[in-house]
Amino acid sequence: MNRLSEQIEAIVRDRLANAKECLAAAKDTFQLKYYKTSAGRLYYAVFHLMRALLNCDGIEMKHHSGVISEFRKRYIKTQIIDSSVSDLISQLYDIRSKSDYSVFYEISAEDIEPFFEETEALFQEIEALLKTMYDNFSVEKGQ
């Protein structure tokens, strides 16, 4: 089995914590009917999950397009992560971009509600993958 350095493991754990926080914020803002904000938080949850896996391979990218492209190349095209995740990424990126930059863009609860389950499933899949790939990996520090 492979081992992550303590530094990389700490970075990955931080990315997972950020993803978890974004997912919680997405749920909270959804309940408040702030659907654009909720969609943005869902996207960023997925973004942090992608960065966590890339960090395991020693890759640090900040630009969204680079992260998405490299994630697809390394994990989706190689079938490590299911190809349906590519659609999830595209849809959330598109909604987040329109929510942030388009005038008069509207989004409803029905538009984003399905993405919660998919994002939570991806979170669980990536955590399980990390535990399988790296024998010293733990989600929580010190475990």
Task: State the predicted function of each range.
Residues 1-143:
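Terminal alpha-helical segments
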